[in-house]
C-alpha cells in the first residue's frame, strides 16, 4: 500500500513530470548486474561479487563500479576498456519488470510527462527496447548523457530544463540513498519505492499506489 501524509500529498501538486530511476524501480536487475560484473571479474581471474559489492555496483555507473571492483589491482584501465566495448545483450534476459510498472506508466500518460534519470549508461536503450518501455517515456537521461552522474543533480536538472518546469512540478521515484540525495539537491520531491527506511516525501510498495496519491487526477 502507499504511505503518504495528507500534508505531503497536498504539497505535491500540481505536477507535470514524473521521473523514475531505472534499476530497482522500473526493473529488477540485480541478477543481470551480478552476471555482468561477475563475467568481467572472471575474465581477470578475480572472485565473484560479494553482497556488499553487489549493493555498490547496483546504484553506480559502470565506470564507478569497475573502479571500485578493481581498486588495488593492475587491471583497472584494462577492465574499464573491456566494459566499454563488451556486449550487454547476453545479460538482458535476466532482467524483470517491476510489477505493474507498465500499467502505471500507461495510466500516467499523456496527462503527465514521464522521464528516466539513471546512472545506467550505454545499456539503457537496450534495456528499454528489450522490455518494451521505449514508447512510455518522453525523455531518458543516462550517465552517458551528463557530465556529472548521480548524486550530482545534473540528470534531474536536465529533465526540468527540457520540460521547462520548476522543481515543485516534478517528483523523482527511486529506491536508494543516492536517489534521495539527488532529489534534495535538485529541490524535487522524492518518492521511495520499496524502501521504507528512506526519509522520503512518500513511500510506494506498488507502482499503482502512485495513481492513488497524485493530486488532481490526471490533469496537467
List where the protein language model places each region.
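Asp-based, Mg2+/Mn2+-dependent phosphohydrolase catalytic module
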Residues: 1-16, 106, 121, 126-220
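N-terminal helical cap/lid subdomain that shapes the substrate entry/recognition surface
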Residues: 2-106, 110
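Generic enzyme active-site microenvironment
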Residues: 19-21, 117, 173
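Alpha-helix N-cap/helix-start motif
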Residues: 29-30, 94, 117, 126, ...
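Secondary-structure boundary/capping positions in well-ordered alpha/beta enzyme cores
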Residues: 47, 72-73, 111-112, 134-135, ...
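Secondary-structure transition/capping residues
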Residues: 48, 64-65, 77, 93, ...
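Proline-centered loop/turn at the N-terminus of a beta-strand
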Residues: 113-115, 189
Amino acid at each position: 500500500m502507499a504511505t503518504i501524509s495528507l500534508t505531503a500529498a497536498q504539497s505535491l501538486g500540481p505536477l507535470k513530470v514524473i521521473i523514475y530511476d531505472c534499476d530497482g524501480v522500473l526493473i529488477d536487475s540485480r541478477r543481470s548486474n551480478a552476471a555482468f560484473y561477475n563475467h568481467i571479474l572472471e575474465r581477470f581471474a578475480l572472485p565473484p561479487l560479494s553482497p556488499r559489492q553487489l549493493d555498490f555496483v547496483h546504484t553506480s555507473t559502470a565506470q564507478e563500479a569497475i573502479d571500485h571492483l578493481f581498486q588495488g589491482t593492475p587491471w583497472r584501465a584494462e577492465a574499464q576498456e573491456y566494459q566499454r566495448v563488451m556486449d550487454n545483450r547476453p545479460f538482458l534476459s535476466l532482467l524483470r519488470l517491476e510489477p505493474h510498472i507498465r500499467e502505471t506508466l500507461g495510466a500516467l500518460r499523456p496527462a503527465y510527462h514521464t522521464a528516466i534519470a539513471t546512472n545506467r549508461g550505454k545499456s539503457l536503450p537496450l534495456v528499454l527496447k528489450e522490455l518494451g518501455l521505449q514508447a512510455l517515456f518522453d525523455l531518458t537521461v543516462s550517465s552517458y548523457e551528463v557530465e556529472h552522474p548521480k548524486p550530482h543533480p545534473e540528470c534531474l536538472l536536465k529533465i526540468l530544463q527540457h520540460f521547462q518546469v520548476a522543481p515543485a512540478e516534478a517528483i523523482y521515484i527511486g529506491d536508494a540513498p543516492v536517489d534521495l540525495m539527488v532529489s534534495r539537491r535538485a529541490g524535487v520531491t522524492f518518492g521511495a519505492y520499496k524502501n521504507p527506511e528512506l526519509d522520503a516525501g512518500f513511500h510506494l510498495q506498488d507502482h499503482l499506489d502512485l495513481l492513488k496519491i497524485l493530486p488532481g487526477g490526471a490533469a496537467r
